[in-house]
Regions:
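Metallocofactor- and cofactor-centric catalytic cores in central/energy metabolism, strongly enriched
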Residues: 2-97, 111-114, 118-150
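Short, flexible, mixed-charge acidic loops at enzyme active sites
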Residues: 96-107
Length: 150
């Protein structure tokens, strides 16, 4: 029998989370994820709640033995994790708006993944990713970290 897997998704309130879950559900026999923990920050709690409810319905419809959890406590979620995914946006959509508008106001490409906007996003995101990695090293050092964050 294959080991059941625990996946922790940092930025679990993202609109990309249902697509990630869909992949786990479709490939359950090859990748037996039994726990999916959705983690977000307080500012993202409303979106986290919406995505959590959608994910529970998806699991029920699929009939797969996978439990979805949600929390704002990253360290709690990381206990015994096998995989940690990141798909976060530090500063929420307001920060993305600034990443795009500030360069545009100076005649440059307004984009969140490259150019000045990408630099702004990177400067906000890299310290948070390091904090996450430090927690992974301390709490679940054998977990694989998969970064989906731009």
């Amino acid at each position: 029998m294959q080991k059941k897997l625990k996946v922790v998704t940092i930025g679990g309130g993202s609109s990309y989370t249902p697509e990630l879950l869909e992949g786990f559900l479709k490939r359950y026999h090859e990748l037996p994820v039994s726990e999916l923990w959705l983690v977000d920050v307080e500012e993202g709690q409303e979106k986290l709640n919406i995505i959590f409810e959608l994910c529970k319905r998806m699991v029920a419809k699929a009939g797969v033995p996978l439990t979805v959890h949600k929390t704002l406590d990253r360290r709690l979620a990381l206990q015994d994790a096998d995989f940690v995914t990141t798909q976060l946006r530090v500063g929420q959509l307001k920060a993305r708006e600034m990443d795009e508008r500030i360069p545009l106001s100076h005649g440059y490409l307004g984009q969140e993944t490259n150019g000045a906007g990408g630099l702004f996003k990177g400067l906000r995101t890299i310290p948070v990713i390091f904090d996450i990695i430090n927690d992974v090293e301390a709490i679940c050092p054998n977990a694989w970290v998969i970064n989906f964050t731009n």
